Amino acid sequence: MESRKRKSELEHYIDKLTDPPEKQRKMAEFYNSLRMFYKRRWNATLKLPHVQGVEVNLYRLYDTVMALGGWQKVAASDKWSDIAEMFGCKDDILCGDHAIKIIYMRYLSKFEQVETIGDVDDYVDNEMSRSRGRNATSFFATNECPISNNRMVQEYQHRDERGQIINEPDYARLTKSLISGLPNEIDFAMNVCMLLSHAGPKQLRICHAPTLLTLLVAHTGVYDEDDETMADMGKEWKRTTKHNFRDFWASSGVPLDMLMTFLDREIEAEYIDEDDQFFTGVSETFNVKDSRCWRLNQVTTIIRNLSFEPANRVTIVKTWPVMKFLIMCASCKWSPLYVAALDALSNLATDIDLTDKTLVYISQHAILRIITDGIFSLDKFKLVRSLEILTGLCGFEGNEAIICDWLNSATIAHIFEVVGVKDIMMCVYTLECLYQISEMGDTACDLISESPKAIQQLVSMATLEAVSFGPAGLAGMKVVEYQPSFTQGSNQQQNPHHSQGGHQLGHSNVRMGGLNHNQHHQQIGPPGAPGAAPMTVRQVIQNNLALQQVQRENLNREQYSTQSSQPHPPHTNVPPSPSILAHHSSGLVQQNGMKFDRRTGNLPVRPIAPSTNSGESQLEQLTEKWIRQNCVFEPAMSTPRGELYAAYVDDLRNLYHSMSGSLAMFSGVMKNLYPDVNFRMAQNGIMIVAQGIRLIRPHRLAPAASQSASESHPLMKKMLTSEPKEENGVLINGHAVQESGAERIIKTEPIRTDEPSVLIESQEQSVPKKQNDINGEETDEVELNSKIVTPEKKSITNGTVEVCQEPIQASKLFDENYANQIEGSEVSIEIREQFVNDTDNVKLESEKINGIICNGNSKVKKESMASRAAHIVAVAAACNGDLERMNVVSNGNDIEKEIEKETEKVEEETNEEKNKEVVETEVVDDAQESEKRKCVPPSSNPTDYMCDWDCCSIYYASPSHVLKHLSEEHVAEELRLLCRWNGCADPTPRNRWSLITHIQDSHCNEAQLKAASQKRKEGGGIAPVRGAPRAEVISRDINNHPGYAKNAAFDAIRRHAFNFLSRELTDEAEGPVTKSIRLTSCLILRNLARYSAEGRQKLRRHESHICWLALSRLESAHALSQLLSELHQAPAAEEEQQKMLSEVPSSASLSSMAGSSSQLPTVPDSPTSSVASAPMKESTSVSNKPTVHINRMLNFSSLNEKTPTSPQFTAGSSPHRHQPIQQHIPSQPSPLVQTTPVRAGAGI
């Protein structure tokens, strides 16, 4: 526009040379940014505008407009005319300024908007144009691409000679492309159909263009017999595409008679048999890289995808060329074709009408032939799809007559054999097929009832569990559960780490079984559990004890209430594990009835003010006294508050015989004594700890915490942290404790005792602890600060020491004058006979323990076994100041010794030498009696393991030999037997391997056999001859625990007696697959009882078992109830049959007629009377059955030509249904023979 004259290329080149490099660089950057903007925004290539063949300089136009403040200011100030003059458009050019405005608004307005304010959504931009600032916008600044062609021009409407608009049918372009026969057009149409066949917003609707399906299969060489035009077009397509599909079908493995029916008779000359391809090798192979095979694969995939849409199924079924193509593909030998074809047929089966003339007369029921071949096939996929197709065909109304005429006893028997295979997918599909067959009425139900063991197998499957199939039963399949949305209440907090196979909340819908499964609602655990450590048994006991006190405190809240000026926080009943309710508005969390600061982690506890109530004041004083005696302030230590409170409650209950205070009062009193103590949440998030408090006396219920001061003592650490089966189970009690690095003397109140006791008065002294190991190994030395007087003791040692004590009722306090010299009572140490190694020289004599203690540390040399036993008894007695009697029990019972000491006298002499204490402890034996030790060499004979099965009494060298003997001699048969082990009272009959497992777990393990051997040696193991089973009662010594009531064990047994009872099979939670299998089998049995008289007769044998299941909580209980009602509601025909049978003359009247057969009345034939006349009327039993009228023109001659086990149909004759059934023995035995299978666990 700058010049009306077009410049030459030379002039443009000269202009570019005159421009400075900076301007050229900016221009290049501008056009590069503009091209990228067009590519990003509209995916278009920038095409510069031209006016009369002259290119418009967009860079100059954009730079000029931006220099004036942008197009909005230019439009508001109406400066477009000034810009036009800059470009050479003067007044002699009409509407030059308008042309400049249109070009800018079309090509550069959006670019300016993005460069200045950024990207704006098109919808927002359009809304801005309708706002109050409309005058600042322009009509020409649209969001459409300026490069699009004919943007404002409407599409051309095709009209006929009358002027009416011609509307082309849907998918007309695809149809024209397929008819054209051009290779590119055909490929393009196939690709478009492939894309439209998939699920999406734009699906291919075949009902709008049914011709499209005919054209698709025509490009595979399959045409309609009535349309010769399509076959002629196929010959033309063959010249252009070079695809010869006749050769492919001739070598595809489709039966010859089917090819001759579907294609033409001339294909017989081109047909390649399997033998021909074996010798000549000229058969075609399926290769997706081949264009012909790829075209077949495309068409089968398109039809398969379209069959999933219900709107397309009817159109596909009514299109005969498509059905013919699917039948041919399902019968071929190439897996990509028959897999897609069988999938499509299984989707279309519910709409296939077997009475259609094309399927009856043209295809000769080829679909039923495919089903027969698939059911008897060894291919799992063909078997499952054939059952699915048969299920769909049975669901179509009108197919009953043809299917019942096609079904036979061999097919039904083979279907029931498939049910017994350990595969969940095959089991589910087979049951669904049998259910649809049983829904067809009397004839089908009679066929199922006549199958041997069919009723028994279905009854056993009513209690089958899917878990019994094992992991291999789920191979190749996946059970998918869909969880609906679940809204929780405000008082629950969902655990984010929910287990998967744990079950999720709500109801789960199972796609495979088609059933709804109600999952149990799982109780949600404590929040904060993601990083929480599991609570130990001791912590659970400790928390339960604390919670009992909290509940007791709620009943007596007013009695122990404090002053109103400093009230306690409100108390609430808390669950066994602390639950946290978060308040988002503040940092406080309600925990155990008290507020907890989330930010600092501290639990605010207010000190307790002095109370005016005398009872409460005494309780506070007693609490303060206990805290002073058992707790010490150490800022670096932390102790669980539950541990402190549990020890406090226990001591007040047993030692002071007083009711303990509440948890809040206990915390307040501790805050009074130690103001710097803070209560905060532990790092694991499940308990509250007292920071700055150390429990100096370990409590029997306290967990083995690493911070506890009780574990600072090595002996206590070993006794507390070890399990009873490995270490000494010592119950620690008392008040004399050694603090680390300092001497602390705590004197208790006077305690009287009736039996010899142990008095401990703290002084710095140590006694080494020697483990009573007969192999001579020493343990760590243990320091102890007490003087020891050992009471009467009995010890049985074998390397493991278990110390037990009785509750302390009283004790005797000696005078302080006699504290340095105490006469001990008689000591009796009983040691059973042991196997002693030669490395230890064991001597029996009166031992004298001389210990030299320097600076509180005692080193004692290695003593004999008796001395070490005395040491461990003394050390344990020193740790437990209230010990009355100590039994050191071990497992060894081979060597028996007795050491009796009548008197022991402990003399302690303290002399100070070189500023060190030297303490000598001397144990004097007044009686000075000694016994000779028996030294018995170890026996070379192994332990005797005896088989006690039904008084067998054969000895073996090891438990494995006994188990082998049992499995080979006593439990060798595959029968359900009772356990005949002498003394076993288990009444459950078991199969062989289940019984062997029971024997191995209960009777034939090493511990049980050793115990029985020892019992026989002692004379108490000779059991009587097998009689009535009896329960053996093992007597135990009653040891009342100081922390529990006398009847605590009885209350616990009564409370938890019914928690661990073995649940019945019907009480187990049914999984979705288990529920589907059980319900389907019960529905089949219900149909058999409803439609078949023979089925009712066989079901009455299982009536008691069915009644038990019908009264259960199973999902199938309702169907079984209907079954029971059908059993006792005989139809009118059956009653009439019984009435007519009653009119038959007796045998006496028949004999009196003397052979006059002409006078005998004829017995009427009925569908269920074939049993009475089986020998004579076996050949005519089927013809007498009242069946639905069917088309006798059906020809099943080609259904089972390749299946030797299936019945052979011939034209004009049909086989008899009541012939002897040919059994098909499965490859593995069916697991469903038993009426009630053994419960295998929770269902899937």
Curated annotation (Swiss-Prot):
Disruption phenotype: Reduces expression of stress-inducible genes containing an ethanol and stress response element (ESRE) in their regulatory regions, such as hsp-16.1 and hsp-16.2; expression is further reduced by RNAi-mediated knockdown of histone demethylase jmjc-1. Reduces life-span. RNAi-mediated knockdown has no effect on the viability of adults at 25 degrees Celsius, but adults are much less robust at 37 degrees Celsius. Reduces embryonic fitness. Residues 623-697 bind DNA. Residues 486-496, 556-566, 610-619, 1159-1186, 1194-1212 have a biased composition (Polar residues). GO terms for cellular component: brahma complex. SMART domains: ARID (SM01014), BRIGHT (SM00501). One of its GO terms (molecular function) is DNA binding. Component of the SWI/SNF-B (PBAF) chromatin remodeling complex. This is SWI/SNF chromatin remodeling complex subunit swsn-7. It comes from Caenorhabditis elegans. The lineage of its organism: Eukaryota, Metazoa, Ecdysozoa, Nematoda, Chromadorea.
